[in-house]
């Protein structure tokens, strides 16, 4: 079973092509023109063992908002398409990741019901040129388009880069767990018979 998807999104604000292979080796080729986002997507692929290619162009002369949000949209769509009928997946994943002084935790339920809980109090508004409020926008876009319940929490931390990076690493590891196929599961992991 090949769990792959390629999604293209073209609007007046962005042009994005994203290819995802769930059962990958952590290989990434990322070009978004938003260097900090490139870094986060690269480590998402590596720590989740997903193969991920992203080629994105957007109206970054205005700001990074449309590009970041639209990549979240397309990543959510790609995950949903690659998972297909979701038969046999574990559905749930959870990971806590330390990064120096920071501890972040992400829990995922690929339930078909989009809901984001985001408890991340970042002490600064920017990382370089990147507006940190866009981290929430990214996760909200993934949640809405995958149809998942995702909780993102930073328990403590001081360095804003470490805090965001720990969130993306925890997200990668939790998503890796949730998307794994368990041979013991017949159908889908729900008493309703549908996700």
UniProtKB/Swiss-Prot annotation:
EC category name: lyase
Pathway it belongs to? Amino-acid biosynthesis; L-histidine biosynthesis; L-histidine from 5-phospho-alpha-D-ribose 1-diphosphate: step 6/9
Q: Which GO terms describe its cellular component?
A: cytoplasm
- Name the record gives this protein: Imidazoleglycerol-phosphate dehydratase
Going by the UniProt record, its keywords in alphabetical order are:
Amino-acid biosynthesis, Cytoplasm, Histidine biosynthesis, Lyase
Task: Please name the source species.
Answer: Geobacter metallireducens (strain ATCC 53774 / DSM 7210 / GS-15)
Gene of origin?
hisB
GO biological process, alphabetically ordered: L-histidine biosynthetic process
Record has Lyase as a keyword: yes
Task: Identify the domain of life.
Answer: Bacteria
Q: Name one GO molecular function term.
A: imidazoleglycerol-phosphate dehydratase activity
Q: Does the keyword Cytoplasm apply?
A: yes
For this protein, the record's InterPro entries field holds: IGPD_sf, ImidazoleglycerolP_deHydtase, ImidazoleglycerP_deHydtase_CS, Ribosomal_Su5_D2-typ_SF
Cysteines paired by S-S bonds: none
Q: Which family does it belong to?
A: Belongs to the imidazoleglycerol-phosphate dehydratase family.
Q: Which PROSITE patterns match?
A: IGP_DEHYDRATASE_1 (PS00954), IGP_DEHYDRATASE_2 (PS00955)
């Amino acid at each position: 079973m090949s769990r792959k998807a390629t999604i293209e999104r073209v609007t007046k604000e962005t042009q994005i092509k994203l290819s995802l292979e769930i059962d990958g080796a952590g290989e990434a080729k990322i070009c978004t023109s938003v260097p900090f986002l490139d870094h986060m997507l690269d480590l998402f692929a590596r720590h989740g063992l997903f193969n991920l290619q992203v080629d994105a162009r957007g109206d970054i002369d205005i700001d990074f908002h449309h590009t970041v949000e639209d990549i979240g949209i397309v990543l959510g769509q790609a995950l949903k398409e690659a998972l297909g009928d979701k038969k046999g997946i574990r559905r749930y994943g959870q990971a806590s990741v330390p990064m120096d002084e920071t501890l972040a935790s992400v829990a995922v339920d690929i339930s078909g019901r989009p809901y984001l809980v985001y408890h991340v109090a970042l002490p600064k508004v920017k990382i370089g040129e990147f507006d940190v409020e866009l981290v929430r926008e990214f996760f909200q876009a993934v949640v809405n388009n995958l149809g998942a319940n995702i909780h993102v929490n930073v328990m403590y931390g001081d360095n804003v880069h470490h805090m965001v990076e720990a969130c993306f690493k925890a997200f990668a590891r939790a998503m890796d767990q949730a998307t794994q196929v368990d041979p013991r599961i017949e159908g889908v992991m729900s008493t309703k018979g549908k996700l």
